Amino acid sequence: MRIDIITVLPEMLEGFFNCSIMSRAQKKGIAEIHIHNLRDYAYDRYRKVDDYPFGGFAGMVMKIEPIDRCISALKAEREYDEIIFTSPDGEQFNQPMANSLSLAKNLIILCGHFKGIDYRIREHFITKEISIGDYVLTGGELAAAVIADAVVRIIPGVISDEQSALSDSFQDNLLAAPVYTRPAEYKGWQVPDVLLSGHEAKIKEWELQQSLERTQRLRPDLLK
């Protein structure tokens, strides 16, 4: 998989993609992450990528020309399954969406900034708008990192223990069961006996029961 991220703050993302699972996925050759500084596609010597909105509205708007130039340059080199814009207006990001996007070969993620982007970009280039929650961030960079991480980590081969990824919260619209490690007893707090029994069927039954109970208590909306 290849993910191209377009941003006005590349330094905000570079460290993230050089750590942990994202770094491992790239070293294994399973994923490629390319970060593009939108200012490199600006027309003027000041590398200006924003301007005042028509109509006298407040704030600044990301200009159409640099975004067009960047996306067009990328599309000239390869086909993309989705061109994603991180936006509070978008569809709420969730695990099923991450699962679906993990099957893609090439993705572009455009990070929103300022008051937004010239709407013509959304009309003529963007194929999918994604929100990571009903709150406002300084820019779309954090959202892009969240999306990329959730998508890449479930590609086969990225995580050595694939069963661990498949049992994460939300994979079956259920929260994960509690997990424990050594010591089995600490300050009188005991690990559930069933987990120490070695009885695989009973452990699986306990895991499902715990997942259902936790989901009903903490996220009943997932069971609807």
From Swiss-Prot:
It is found in: Cytoplasm. It holds the Pfam family tRNA_m1G_MT. One of its GO terms (molecular function) is tRNA (guanine(37)-N1)-methyltransferase activity. It comes from the Bacteria. It catalyses: guanosine(37) in tRNA + S-adenosyl-L-methionine = N(1)-methylguanosine(37) in tRNA + S-adenosyl-L-homocysteine + H(+). Disulfide bonds: none annotated. Its EC number is 2.1.1.228. It is an enzyme of class 2 (transferase). Gene3D superfamilies: 3.40.1280.10, tRNA(m1g37)methyltransferase, domain 2. S-adenosyl-L-methionine binds at residues 112, 132-137. One of its GO terms (biological process) is tRNA N1-guanine methylation. Its main location: cytoplasm. Keywords: Cytoplasm, Methyltransferase, S-adenosyl-L-methionine, Transferase, tRNA processing. CDD domains: TrmD-like. GO terms for cellular component: cytosol. Belongs to the RNA methyltransferase TrmD family. Homodimer. NCBIfam families: PRK00026.1 (NF000648), trmD (TIGR00088). Specifically methylates guanosine-37 in various tRNAs. HAMAP family: TrmD. This is tRNA (guanine-N(1)-)-methyltransferase. It comes from Phocaeicola vulgatus (strain ATCC 8482 / DSM 1447 / JCM 5826 / CCUG 4940 / NBRC 14291 / NCTC 11154) (Bacteroides vulgatus). The gene is trmD.
